[in-house]
Amino acid sequence: MTAFPPSRQSPDVPPDGLPAPGRFAHLDPGDGACLMESAALLAGGDFTDSPAGTHPALAALARVVNDSVGDATRHALWPLAAEFADARPLDRAYTSLLVGSVVDAARVLRPASWRLARHGRACRRRSEKLTHTPAGGLPGRAADLLWWRGPGRRYLEHALRVLCAAPDADQRLARLLRRAVAEARDRTAGDGVARGGRVPAGEGREGRCNR
């Protein structure tokens, strides 16, 4: 059984000197910080909403959740901020697995949606194809990046629009993000990646999902 790395605990409220949780991106910590910007500060990095230790697809999910939920839920999610520093799995199937889990959550609300069903099948096919595929190699990384910036992101955005329209959207989105972070950290630990390790080439800052 894979040993899980010790979790860095965030306080329930931001410590003195750290910005209060807020929606959207910020130019300066004095104006507040979204969940990803808080994660970057806690990791000791630059003030950015795309911290190096967080997988781009997970960061995109976190930005949408942060910007879509109410203030109370956003503050309740603050303890997750430190977890994002070690949430960048290297296995190539991870992106499609994450997007597929969001699509599945949306299908609970719209089980008859042919579009969501098609997106879910596409994610499953890609995940099955890439499971146990080595992470190395520029061609593979380029193909993964193209999928994420193309259909992967479109599938994620559509599923999140469905979830955001639910009457209990805050609860659904918060639960989804908590599970996604836990899964990403578990997979990162399984990769044997050193905490705060180097970001693989070609996987730098991603475009934003919702901005």
Summary of predicted features, one role per range:
Residues F47-G204, R208-R211:
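Structured binding/interaction patches within domain cores
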